[in-house]
Amino acid sequence: PDVSSAASDVYKRQDIKLLFGCDTGVGNIYKDIGNKYGPIDLTFINIGAYNFYPIMPYKDKSVYHTNPEEALEVAKNLKSKKVIGMHWGTFVLSLEPIMEPPVRFKAGAEKYGFKKDDAIIYKIGEFGSLKKLLDYN
């Protein structure tokens, strides 16, 4: 597939590293990024819009969107300390139940080495503070 329109970016400010994974699938590149730039303090990654079967039977999952467990795997490969699941529940792009991604994301956190509080889901419309999340002044 043409991945030129998909993007993930690492942002660094002082000693803080953030990764914003936008419209991304799973790949070995994240181990490479983790080895080169890790540990990442906070990763933002998509967890929704991944189930396209049976409307596209030749494509049983999205190559552009991780499911919740794949998102946790990516964050683990990045050596992320914390991970925020995003890109879910806004509007229907695929066939998984619209509220399934955050439930699966939180349920799978410990399996991928994250404390439940370090796999973060915001309610629709909720916002948070990077200072609070990263414990810096």
What positions do the PLM features span?
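Single conserved hydrophobic/aromatic residue that forms the stacking wall/gate
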Residues: P1-A7, Y11
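Cap/insert and terminal regions of metallo-dependent hydrolase folds
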Residues: K17, G25-Y122
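A short acidic, often aromatic-flanked loop/helix-cap motif at beta-alpha or helix-coil junctions
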Residues: I124-K131
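Short, surface-exposed amphipathic charged segments that create phosphate/polyanion-binding patches used
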Residues: K132-N137
